[in-house]
């Protein structure tokens, strides 16, 4: 458990952790490239390590260290055992597609209790359109998933754009193996597009080209066939999702902090956290590779479309508690199918602290109360809730006890140490 007490001031310079999204994609691309790749500044978090270990089961040789991962990619081989991806939905979804391209046999992919509840059917349906056999062992669209090796036999695949961008990323990373050019056609408006921009960016660095396309008012992507992944040296940038908690702490508390390793021109959608706090009234200084914050600021409630930024919702919910007026979060139906139902969880748990939150079908309405009280909070094994609730606890009267703090190892392994280094009054017990 994490014990959080009111924190009068924070100050210091700290690095944002490396990007989880970039690390996942880069290690998988490197494993598919014949030759030696070097990933510098990777995220040594549980989810990304799941991707690395899974790639080893498909034949890659990977040397892991804190500063870099050295990866010798090879032709895909059939795993000798069941591929257990732990709690990483990204790993499960990308490798479900990729595993269809082993030369022979079957792949079985599974994960922990949480992963075995995450929806997979849209991806399985898409693979079926491509002529790939895959199925849920429970016949309910969840892991364990069985995938049979096979050639891609159809050139067009249709998939919803409003479920999970990870399904589309999986197709983007699999279709270059096709002997023919392919198209992905989105049948509904796209959500979380920045994550697909990250996928396209990483693929490009490894020699694979994806072209955005629109036909008959439907967005989609074109992928050339017979493409080959090429090894490279790749530097992982800092993670704006994880930096959002540092930004929130900076604008809400008496602060003087510099957050390094976050880039002004990043393709990450969650860089929007900077614009959000600015619109709420914070005078944040954004430089080429860092953010400087001297708080606190008097924030005002605003309306925020979270179509492309679902991971920022817990952070926004906490900011809204201390803003004047109402903060409205909308277009967030997909936030319900993350590690947990984050809309319901934020409503229930922050209400225990005295927050005024109304849960809507696609979002939240938060009325600023300016003052929260310490409480015992559940986090449902969700790393983003742990970190967002920690910031709330640092401003609350009394003591806040947060369960499940171990989940931060997924995306921000040294979160507690870094927060303590700038003066946060938190302890693990």
UniProtKB/Swiss-Prot annotation:
Indicate which residues the UniProt annotation says bind phosphoenolpyruvate. 20, 89, 118, 166, 342, 384
Q: Which GO terms describe its cellular component?
A: cytoplasm
| Any single biological process term in GO | amino acid biosynthetic process
Gene encoding it? aroA
UniProt subunit comment: Monomer.
Q: Does the keyword Transferase apply?
A: yes
Protein species of origin? Methanococcus maripaludis (strain C6 / ATCC BAA-1332)
Entry keyword DNA repair? no
Name recorded for this polypeptide: 3-phosphoshikimate 1-carboxyvinyltransferase
Binding-site positions, 3-phosphoshikimate: 20-21, 25, 164-166, 192, 311, 338
Enzyme class, one word?
transferase
Q: What does this protein do?
A: Catalyzes the transfer of the enolpyruvyl moiety of phosphoenolpyruvate (PEP) to the 5-hydroxyl of shikimate-3-phosphate (S3P) to produce enolpyruvyl shikimate-3-phosphate and inorganic phosphate.
> Where is the secretion signal located?
none
* Principal localisation: cytoplasm
Q: Where in the cell is it found?
A: Cytoplasm
Source organism superkingdom: Archaea
């Amino acid at each position: 458990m994490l014990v959080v007490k009111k924190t009068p001031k924070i100050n210091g310079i700290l690095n944002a952790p490396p990007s989880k999204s970039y690390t996942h994609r880069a290690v998988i691309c490197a494993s598919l490239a014949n030759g030696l790749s070097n990933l510098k500044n990777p995220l040594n978090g549980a989810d990304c390590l799941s991707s690395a270990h899974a790639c080893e089961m498909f034949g890659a040789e990977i040397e892991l260290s804190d500063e870099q991962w050295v990866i010798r990619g090879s032709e895909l081989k059939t795993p000798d055992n069941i591929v257990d991806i732990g709690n990483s939905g990204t790993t499960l979804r990308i490798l479900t597609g990729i595993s269809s391209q082993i030369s022979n046999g079957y792949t079985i992919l599974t994960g922990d209790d949480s992963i075995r509840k995450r929806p997979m059917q849209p991806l399985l349906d898409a693979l079926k359109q491509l002529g790939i056999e895959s199925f849920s062992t429970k016949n309910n669209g969840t892991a364990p998933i069985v995938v049979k090796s096979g050639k891609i036999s159809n050139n067009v695949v249709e998939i919803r754009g409003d479920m999970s961008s990870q399904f589309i990323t999986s197709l983007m990373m699999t279709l270059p193996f096709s002997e023919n050019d392919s198209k992905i056609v989105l049948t509904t408006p796209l959500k979380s597009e920045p994550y697909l921009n990250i996928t396209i960016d990483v693929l490009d660095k490894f020699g694979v080209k994806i072209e955005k396309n629109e036909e008959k008012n439907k967005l989609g992507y074109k992928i050339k066939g017979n493409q080959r992944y090429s090894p490279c040296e790749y530097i992982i940038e800092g993670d704006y999702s994880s930096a959002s908690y540092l930004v929130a702490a900076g604008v809400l508390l008496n602060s003087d902090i510099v957050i390094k390793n976050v880039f002004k021109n990043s393709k990450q959608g969650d860089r929007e956290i900077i614009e959000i706090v600015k619109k709420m009234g914070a005078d944040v200084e954004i430089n080429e590779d860092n953010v400087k914050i001297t708080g606190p600021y008097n924030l005002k409630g605003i309306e925020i479309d979270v179509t492309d930024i679902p991971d920022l919702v817990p952070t926004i919910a906490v900011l809204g508690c201390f803003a004047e007026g109402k903060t409205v979060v909308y277009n967030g139906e997909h936030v319900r199918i993350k590690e947990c139902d984050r809309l319901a969880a934020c409503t229930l748990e922050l209400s225990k602290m005295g927050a005024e939150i109304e849960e809507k079908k696609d979002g939240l309405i938060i009325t600023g109360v300016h003052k929260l009280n310490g409480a015992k909070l559940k986090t449902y094994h969700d790393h983003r809730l742990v970190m967002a609730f920690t910031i709330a606890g640092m401003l609350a009267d009394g003591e806040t006890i947060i369960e499940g703090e171990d989940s931060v190892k997924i995306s921000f392994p040294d979160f507690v140490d870094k927060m303590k280094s700038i003066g946060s009054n938190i302890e693990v017990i």
